[in-house]
């Protein structure tokens, strides 16, 4: 399940643009929105007020973890538990991650998925980010959303879904379904933002996961792709 585009709100498009520009990402402004390119994916942010924080993860090439870690810590603040800034994923994920402080309170993540092919790079740069790997989506009923996605052929990934957390998709792209107000790991204070989110992906038909929370096919028209709410 490749995430082609994610449409979500931010309190400040200028803050988002400045942050990702500092990382070296390609930024495009279009009226009241800003679009950030992450490899094969795009993130489009539109200004609106809301409470809480978003979570996004970006896939890095397998074999580049140490170089990516060094590159990242020179550009932003890493999030930690104690003095630990590197985290192994669940055994079923075969991954490891670095979390970092994003703009507008975002909890961002670089993730190396060992099931993907190894790719060597001389020195890590923003161009080596492969895609948006995960996007957090607050839903009123996690298990009901899992059922909706399963019926469309998008299955749970890794650990068994619970009433407040489920990863759904595959190694190429995941929706992280969570209940509003839950803390984003590895913090205990940044709470899940309950906002409209639209994810453009390889689904064949549009799906609603809650008020303003939707999955849209890449073939949808611009009007159909627009965030709800």
Residue ranges and their predicted role:
Residues 1-3, 9-29, 37-82, 101-229:
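Glyoxalase I/VOC metalloenzyme domain signal
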Residues 85-88:
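Surface-exposed loop and turn segments in beta-propeller and other repeat-based domains
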Residues 92-95:
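Short, small/polar residue-rich loop motifs at catalytic or cofactor-binding pockets
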């Amino acid at each position: 399940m490749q995430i082609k585009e994610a449409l979500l709100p931010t309190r400040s498009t200028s803050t988002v643009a400045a942050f990702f520009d500092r990382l070296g990402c390609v930024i495009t402004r279009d009226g009241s929105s800003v679009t950030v390119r992450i490899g094969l994916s795009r993130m489009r942010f539109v200004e609106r007020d809301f409470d809480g924080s978003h979570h996004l993860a970006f896939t890095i090439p397998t074999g580049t973890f140490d170089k990516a870690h060094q590159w990242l810590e020179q550009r932003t603040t890493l999030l930690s538990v104690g003095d630990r800034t590197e985290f192994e994923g669940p055994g079923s994920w075969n991954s490891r991650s670095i979390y970092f402080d994003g703009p507008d309170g975002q909890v961002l993540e670089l993730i190396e998925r060992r099931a993907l092919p190894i790719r060597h790079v001389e020195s890590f740069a923003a161009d080596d980010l492969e895609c948006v790997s995960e996007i957090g989506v607050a839903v009123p009923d996690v298990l009901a959303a899992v059922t909706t996605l399963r019926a469309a052929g998008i299955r749970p990934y890794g650990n068994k879904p619970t009433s407040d957390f489920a990863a759904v998709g595959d190694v190429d792209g995941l929706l992280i379904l969570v209940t509003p107000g839950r803390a984003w790991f590895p913090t205990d204070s940044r709470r899940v933002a309950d906002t409209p989110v639209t994810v453009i992906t390889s689904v064949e038909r549009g799906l609603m996961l809650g008020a303003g929370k939707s999955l849209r096919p890449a073939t949808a028209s611009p009007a159909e792709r627009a965030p709800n709410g």
